[in-house]
């Protein structure tokens, strides 16, 4: 690998803005905000959705069936 061309990979704290849940992970993302997490200071990255608030992971998922073009065609012409 060539030196000085890759972004710095470091630990950062991601915070779900809808639930306030925080978790530590590695990232190359930069931030001006910092937060104290488990006794250490890390850069803070705010996210709108994480595994703590996403419906797939929380079990509060809604299943909606959107009619596609084929379904609309079949309805229109009385097929099936």
Swiss-Prot record:
Protein name in the entry: Large ribosomal subunit protein bL31B
Keywords tagged on the record: Ribonucleoprotein, Ribosomal protein
Keyword RNA-binding listed: no
PROSITE patterns linked: RIBOSOMAL_L31
Family the entry assigns: Belongs to the bacterial ribosomal protein bL31 family. Type B subfamily.
Alphabetized InterPro entries for the sequence: Ribosomal_bL28/bL31-like_sf, Ribosomal_bL31, Ribosomal_bL31_B, Ribosomal_bL31_sf
A GO biological process held by the record: translation
Transmembrane regions: none
Record's subunit section: Part of the 50S ribosomal subunit.
GO CC terms in record: ribonucleoprotein complex; ribosome
Name of the gene encoding the protein in the UniProt record: rpmE2
MF GO annotations: structural constituent of ribosome
SS bond list: none
